[in-house]
Amino acid sequence: MSSRGTRFRSESTLAVDGRTGATVRQVTAAPAIHHHPFFFVPAYDDAMRRLVFVSHRTGAPQLFAEERASGDLVQLTDQPGIAEWSVHPSHDGRFVYYTAGAEGWRVDCTTCEAEQVAVFGDVALREQGMVGAAMGTTALSRDDRWWAVKFNEGPVACLAVVDTRDRSWEVILRRDTIGHQQFCPDDDTLLFYAGPLTDRVWLVNRDGSGNRRLHERAPGQWVTHETWLPGRRELAFVDWPHGMRAIDVDSGAERQVTTVNAWHAASRRDGRRMVADTNFPDIGLQLFDPTDGVGAPTTLCHPAASSLGAHWAGPFPYADGPVAVHAPQHTHPHPSFAPDGSRVVFTSDRTGFAQVYEVTVGEEFA
């Protein structure tokens, strides 16, 4: 018997960050791994009716949502083989998109009925490993029509775009490696994708034309964790551990965003604030203005996550190609804003199990 639609009573508890005074709400509490979607993927629908997360409480990763109206936690899926970092809620709140096996799926958030959206054939939707392209993240355009999914045909990486209206799809790009694809929030005909670790920052048009490098890294530079800045047609990236930079995708102009050791940074919907976790050293979640060329940081709270990944403490490790690393993603905070900017969702394993949290953002950061 399927456990889809099972409701769990609210597990919410409130606490105050002892160093910043911020109000922190723990959303999940079961003794299992939980995490929200990756940092550049929204965890909420636009109306904030639900907070979507992944829970292992049933013994395998399944999609769940916290309902705002009731506080209940609702199990949305009961399906084997879900790629837990492929999760992408639709902006209109109707569906959550995800991959399982070699197929694309979506689940109706009201009925918990899952439907197949695409069958990609004899392919691998994830590469080996814990980071980058191995995570299997997907991207949904701002209007919820276009869904970008990466898979591998043998050694060849393929980027497919699915039309969610008629469920047709086509491969728009084939190359050596593709990961972390993201639609531009202001132009659903344009995508960023991460290429090789030594040459990461690329753009491609939704129809497959215009594949081009946006940034060429300097020797020894560690470029990672790219994300769009809404309203500006700029792509920001982490220049680890020296801060963040941004590039105008039309002019190619490059600028400094912040010098704080931002690790995973996400923009607020209006593009006027970013939030980032930090590591080596972990100085907590940092808020800053990404538009003023300074990005002076203010500490929001301290997730106290284990943030595993010892390779981040040293120089760029991928000069001679990929290397094996131990960096379980559920140990990383991956903060991101709610659509209205009133709170930030993050994950922390500080209790011994990875749980989902929200922290309130004060009015002084409006």
Spans of model-derived segments:
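Multi-bladed beta-propeller domains
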Residues: 15-35, 66-83, 109-132, 161-177, ...
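Solenoidal tandem-repeat scaffolds enriched in leucines and small polar residues
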Residues: 131-213
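Beta-strand C-termini and the immediately following turn/loop, strongest in propeller blades
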Residues: 3, 52-58, 96-103, 107-109, ...
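Blade-level signature of beta-propeller repeat domains, shared across WD40, Kelch, NHL, RCC1
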Residues: 328-366
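Residue-level detector of Asp-centered blade-edge/turn motifs that repeat once per structural unit
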Residues: 46-47, 91-92, 142-143, 185-187, ...
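Asp-box/WD-like beta-propeller blade repeats and closely related beta-sheet repeat scaffolds
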Residues: 81-90, 94, 98-157, 172-173
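Blade/loop signatures of beta-propeller domains
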Residues: 2-25, 150, 158
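Repeated scaffold domains used in trafficking and secretory/extracellular systems
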Residues: 37-41, 83-88, 128, 133-138, ...
